[in-house]
Amino acid sequence: MIKGIGIDTTRISRIEKMVNTLTDGALGRLFTEAELSEAANRGGAASYEYLATRFAAKEAVFKALASLTEKKRFDLRIVETLNTPDGAPYVNPIYKSLQGEKLDSILQETGVTALHISMTTEGDYATAFVIAEGIDGPSGISPALAIITPPRAR
């Protein structure tokens, strides 16, 4: 069952500017070591595209989960997006932030069992789309449906 969806678009030029003006420490508060390492391996414009899609992914995951949890903010580093050997993106739910926060804990709290992600770039834009899949709420209906459907209409 779909529990949440999230989408985000960011300008690649915005990420390029961030990379060129922020310190390594500041970038390390936005991206994981693995994400920064892969971007460095790609080099040049490809590194900016890579980081822009990762930034959009972090925002899209947050949007997909925001209505399912009391948390209205979380450390962006807990959303680590990597690629399988064949190039498909995936969200690594077991990455742990420096504060000990883990995406896996939020997924368990919200009943989300899988995050499906798609990312793309076009011109100066990077977009990520996320579907949060999970189990029904305690009443047997989706919590999101319970929010938008008046009780007498159920």
Which residues make up each language-model segment?
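Core catalytic alpha/beta fold that binds nucleotide/phospho-ligands
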Residues: M1-R154
